[in-house]
Amino acid sequence: MTDICSLSLTAVAQALQKKELSAVDVTTACLDRITATEPHLAALLYVNAENALARATTLDSEGPDAARPLWGVPVTLKDAFSTRGMPTTAGSRMLEGYTPFYDAFAVQKLHEAGAVILGKTNLDEFAMGSSTENSAFKVTRNPWNLNKVPGGSSGGSAASVTAGQCFASLGTDTGGSIRQPASFCGCVGLKPTYGRVSRYGVIAYGSSLDQVGPLTRSVEDCARVLTAIAGYDSRDNTCDPRPAEDYAATLSSRPLKGARLGIPREFYGQGLSDEVRAACEAAIQAARNQDAELVEVSLPHTDAAIATYYIIAMAEASSNLARFDGVRFGHRSADIKNLDDLYVHSRTEGFGPEVKRRIMLGAYVLSSGYYDAYYRKAAQVRRLIRDELLAALGQCDALLAPVSPVTARDLGGNTADPLQIYLMDAYTLSLNLAGLPGLSLPVGLGAKSGMPVGMQIIGKPFEETQVLALGHSLEQALPGIGRPAL
């Protein structure tokens, strides 16, 4: 008998529509998988078992609905999405015990599409990290090697999808937080164009950088989820009004044959590990074998992207997290004598060390006397980085680049050196600065580490159709990496 949890989202969705499987069958299989794997992975912060089974039972009683593309499909959510009646912590003691009274827009869209919400996944606190080790509650492990990190900050989502606990998970990407864990865990992850998916109901980190996207096991699955969650929402004034497309229906619209693909010189220079380089070069050769045209392009300001990103992200974080003060919701210190004590003690007790570091640095770059030297300068360089990327994309259909310079590192490694951790985002954060779409696709296993390697397909604004179609074509041209023996 086929293991339900090993199927793709697309295969399960089709079987559900044909009544070859019931929503209760699929949901029960995923909950059993969670029970078996969660003690090893620690991917989930909250399991919504009772409500998920009730939802599946209701769906079965109503019968399949072809107009609902995720009918009966179990999914998980990064715990940065507001969920009515379910705890939402952002991985922080500051929000421990907080239960919203409304759903985020993307969660509403999943409900409308017929999905079954299984639970909430672990993340770095307030999405600030690249390993999911910064969570206040637990440390998530990589399904390929339990001694390795899953990446971050959406590490729980990537681990959950790869381990077969669910068929898709929603994450957020501020500087690579969907793409990097997808690369480390060997699944597909998409950061859409800024404004393609509403951020309403998402706990904000960097408001000009954050974007919502799916993590799945295949590009076709990713396209199906994006179709479900994309669309205009008036409650997010950065949400773009142009209508969403049926991304799954257009996957054959752009084959690799005849495609002009750019290779950014700066992404393949010093610092790229040998095993990541080899896997990416093999993927480039696979594209060439499909008659794609490969051209070298240059992005001269790549070296400035890390500093630019962290100045802007930390400045926005210091502003966004000012609302967590112990007054309205979240952690409230008991050790208070006056209003100042309430603010200081609540925030000191509620926030972890990495969040405090970013708040302090953000406040510094926004302070009088330093605003022009840091924040204003970073905003200017951000424009240069965006212009360079758009100029490069003007020469080709998409760019191919590594997601991370290395494969997943050991748990506990480099945790005392924030700068080394920040460097892990060197190849992903430019897309957030520019607001461009990027798809992380597994292209091989490291020859030395045996860990997954991901490659980014970078596209022009709102050209997710082409990014996904090229990703689908490249996925078909590659042998695949299999699944971890968890």
UniProtKB/Swiss-Prot annotation:
**Name of the molecule in the record:** Glutamyl-tRNA(Gln) amidotransferase subunit A
Q: Give the record's family classification.
A: Belongs to the amidase family. GatA subfamily.
List, alphabetically, the GO terms of the cellular component aspect.
glutamyl-tRNA(Gln) amidotransferase complex
NCBIfam families xref list: gatA (TIGR00132)
Q: Which domain of life is it from?
A: Bacteria
GO molecular function list: ATP binding; glutaminyl-tRNA synthase (glutamine-hydrolyzing) activity
Q: What is its EC number?
A: 6.3.5.7
Report which reactions are catalysed by this protein. Answer: L-glutamyl-tRNA(Gln) + L-glutamine + ATP + H2O = L-glutaminyl-tRNA(Gln) + L-glutamate + ADP + phosphate + H(+)
Source taxonomy lineage? Bacteria, Pseudomonadati, Thermodesulfobacteriota, Desulfovibrionia, Desulfovibrionales
**Role:** Allows the formation of correctly charged Gln-tRNA(Gln) through the transamidation of misacylated Glu-tRNA(Gln) in organisms which lack glutaminyl-tRNA synthetase. The reaction takes place in the presence of glutamine and ATP through an activated gamma-phospho-Glu-tRNA(Gln).
SUPFAM superfamilies for the chain: Amidase signature (AS) enzymes
User: What keywords would UniProt list here?
Assistant: ATP-binding, Ligase, Nucleotide-binding, Protein biosynthesis
Name the catalytic site residues.
K78 (charge relay system), S153 (charge relay system), S177 (acyl-ester intermediate)
A GO BP annotation: translation
Q: Which HAMAP family match?
A: GatA
Top EC category? ligase
